[in-house]
C-alpha cells in the first residue's frame, strides 16, 4: 500500500494537526476524523454502549470506524504494525463470482501471494467469559445546549447467547422477527408499559458470541426498569403460551424469500462476498448460504414443537449473561467537549517554541500543496484491472408470451431468479362511475388488513407473511391511444414458486 512510503496519506485519511497562521488556534482534521464526528447518532452510540456493558473490556465494544475522541491517539507506526500483522494473505479470504477467466484470476493471485510466506496469525475475537449475573450501564451522549432531552434516552436490553449452535443462532434470527412483530407478547407488554415508545428487536451475529437486543427509544432514563420488566413479562408469556405456528412459518417463508432474491441485487458479487466473508470470519465456515437455506427448511418441522420456545427460555428469559445500557442525551455536553479539546490544543500550542510553531505552519502549507496535486497518470493506469474494450456487452433477451383467453390478456416471462414468481393483476374500472373511484382505492388499500369470514386479522397477517414476499393493491392507469387512460385496480405480489401450486 502507498501509505507504507507516504506518511502524508495517514495524515490525510486519519488525522493531523492543522495551523493556518501563527496566530490561529491549532485544530485537528482528517477525512476519517471528520466523518466519524458526524457519523455517530444516539442510536449507534447506544448500540456500542450495550456492547461495552455486555462485553466489559473487550474490543467488541469498540467503534470499528473510530471514536473521534480516540482517533488522535493513533500513530503512524501503530497503523503500519497493525497492517503488517493482520492484512496478510494468511488471514485473507478470496471470493470469486461471475463468468470469469479463472486461469487469469489465479495467475494474478499467484503473482501477488507468492511474495508472502504462510504464517499463523492470532486474531483476537473479543470473546469474554459468560457473566453470572445481569449488569447495568449508564452513558451520556453529547447534544447542543438548549436541546430538549425529555423522552430522548435510548435503552438497550441485551442477551448474549453463549454456546449457541449455528442452527440455534439461525433460530434466534427468526425468533427476533417474531418478537418484534405486531401482536407478539413482548411488543404488547412494552406498548402497554411505555405507551408511545419506539421498540425493536435485533440479533447481532457478527461476533463469536451472538447478541440479542431489545431496544426502546423515546423514553426517559428512569424507564429502564420498566422496560426490562416489560420485556421479561412478554418473554414469560411466550414461554407459557407458546408461539403461533402460522406466524413462525410466515417469518421463515419471508426469510427464504429474502435468501432466494439475493441474486436480484445490482451488486450481487460484492454482496455475496461480504456475506460469505463475514460468516467465515466468525464461524470459519464457507457454506453459510447453503447451511442457512437448509436450516430454514428444517425449522418448518420445528415450528409447532416448542423449539422456538426453548430458545427463548434458554438464551433470553433465563440467561444470566444479560444487561441494560441506558444512553442519555445531555444538553450542553457537546459544547463542553469541544471546549475541552480546544483548551488541550491551546495548551499544546502554548508549550511549543516559536520554531515548532513555524514548523507546524510550514507543514500545514506543504500538506495543502501536496494534497492539491493530481495523482500521476501512471498510478491511475496501474489501478485499472480491465480496459473498456475488455468489458462485455450483455444484452439479455427475455422471451415473453402474450395470450388472450376469454377476453383476458395474459403476459408471462421467465426470470433468472430461482424459485420466485411475480404476479401483476390489472382489473379494469371502465364501468365504475367517476364519483366512486375513490371507494375502489379505499377498498384496495384495505385488502389484507382486515378480518374475513373465515380468518381473523392476525390470521390474515400470518398467511400474508407466509405466502407473499410482498403485496400491493391500489389504483393505477394504463395509457391508451392519445391522451386517454384506462383506470384499473392493480394487484401485485411476489411469492415462492411452491406456493403458486
Label the predicted regions:
Residues 155-246, 406-411, 415, 421-481:
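Structured mid-domain segments that build the active-site/substrate or prosthetic-cofactor binding neighborhood
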Residues 62, 84-90, 148-151, 205-210, ...:
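Short, flexible turn/loop "capping" segments at secondary-structure junctions
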Residues 36-43, 48-93, 162, 221-222, ...:
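Histidine-acidic residue clusters that define the catalytic metal-binding segment
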Residues 91-95, 154, 211-213, 322-324, ...:
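Beta-sheet entry/capping signal
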Residues 14-16, 23, 27-28, 33, ...:
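Non-catalytic interaction/regulatory segments
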Residues 33, 37, 43-45, 51-52, ...:
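His/Glu-based metal-binding/catalytic segments typifying zinc-dependent metallopeptidases
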Residues 1-82, 170-173, 180, 186-189, ...:
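Acidic/histidine-enriched segments that form metal/cofactor-coordinating
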Amino acid at each position: 500500500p502507498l501509505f507504507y512510503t507516504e506518511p502524508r496519506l495517514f495524515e490525510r485519511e486519519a488525522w493531523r494537526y492543522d495551523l493556518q497562521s501563527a496566530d490561529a488556534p491549532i485544530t485537528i482534521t482528517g477525512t476519517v476524523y471528520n466523518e466519524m464526528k458526524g457519523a455517530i447518532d444516539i442510536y449507534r452510540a447506544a448500540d456500542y454502549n450495550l456492547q461495552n456493558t455486555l462485553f466489559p473490556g473487550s474490543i467488541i465494544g469498540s467503534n470499528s470506524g473510530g471514536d473521534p475522541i480516540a482517533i488522535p491517539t493513533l500513530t503512524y507506526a501503530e497503523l503500519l504494525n497493525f497492517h503488517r500483522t493482520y492484512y496478510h494473505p494468511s488471514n485473507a479470504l478470496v471470493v470469486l463470482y461471475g463468468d470469469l477467466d479463472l486461469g487469469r484470476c489465479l495467475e494474478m493471485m499467484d503473482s501477488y501471494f507468492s511474495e508472502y510466506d504462510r504464517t499463523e496469525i492470532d486474531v483476537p475475537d473479543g470473546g469474554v467469559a459468560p457473566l453470572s449475573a445481569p449488569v447495568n450501564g449508564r452513558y451520556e451522549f453529547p447534544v447542543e445546549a438548549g436541546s430538549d432531552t425529555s423522552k430522548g434516552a435510548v435503552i438497550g436490553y441485551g442477551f448474549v447467547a453463549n454456546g449457541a449452535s449455528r442452527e440455534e443462532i439461525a433460530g434466534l434470527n427468526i425468533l427476533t422477527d417474531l418478537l418484534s412483530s405486531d401482536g407478539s407478547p413482548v411488543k404488547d407488554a412494552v406498548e402497554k408499559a411505555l405507551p408511545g415508545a419506539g421498540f425493536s428487536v435485533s440479533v447481532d451475529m457478527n461476533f463469536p458470541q451472538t447478541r440479542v437486543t431489545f431496544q426502546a427509544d423515546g423514553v426517559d432514563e428512569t424507564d429502564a426498569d420498566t422496560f426490562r420488566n416489560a420485556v421479561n413479562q412478554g418473554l414469560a408469556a411466550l414461554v407459557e403460551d407458546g408461539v403461533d405456528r402460522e406466524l413462525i412459518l410466515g417469518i421463515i417463508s419471508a426469510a427464504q424469500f429474502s435468501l432466494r432474491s439475493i441474486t436480484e441485487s445490482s451488486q450481487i458479487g460484492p454482496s455475496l462476498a461480504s456475506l460469505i466473508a463475514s460468516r467465515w470470519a466468525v464461524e470459519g465456515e464457507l457454506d453459510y448460504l447453503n447451511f442457512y437455506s437448509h436450516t430454514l427448511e428444517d425449522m418448518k418441522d420445528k415450528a409447532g414443537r416448542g423449539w422456538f420456545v426453548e430458545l427463548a427460555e434458554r438464551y433470553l428469559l433465563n440467561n444470566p449473561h444479560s444487561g441494560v445500557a441506558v444512553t442519555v442525551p445531555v444538553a450542553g455536553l457537546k459544547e463542553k467537549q469541544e471546549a475541552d479539546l480546544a483548551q488541550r490544543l491551546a495548551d499544546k500550542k502554548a508549550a511549543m517554541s516559536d520554531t515548532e510553531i513555524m514548523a507546524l505552519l510550514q507543514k500545514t502549507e506543504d500538506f495543502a500543496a501536496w494534497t492539491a496535486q493530481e495523482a500521476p497518470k501512471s498510478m491511475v493506469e496501474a489501478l485499472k484491472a480491465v480496459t473498456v474494450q475488455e468489458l462485455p456487452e450483455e444484452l439479455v433477451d427475455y422471451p415473453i408470451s402474450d395470450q388472450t383467453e376469454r377476453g383476458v390478456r395474459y403476459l408471462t416471462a421467465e426470470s433468472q431468479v430461482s424459485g420466485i414468481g411475480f404476479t401483476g393483476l390489472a382489473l379494469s374500472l371502465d364501468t365504475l362511475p367517476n364519483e366512486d373511484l375513490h371507494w375502489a382505492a379505499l377498498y384496495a388499500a384495505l385488502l389484507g388488513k382486515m378480518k374475513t369470514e373465515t380468518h381473523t386479522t392476525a390470521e390474515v397477517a400470518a398467511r400474508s407473511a407466509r405466502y407473499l414476499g410482498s403485496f400491493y393493491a391500489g389504483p393505477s392507469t394504463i395509457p391508451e391511444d392519445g391522451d386517454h387512460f384506462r383506470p384499473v385496480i392493480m394487484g401485485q405480489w411476489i411469492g415462492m414458486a411452491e406456493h403458486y401450486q
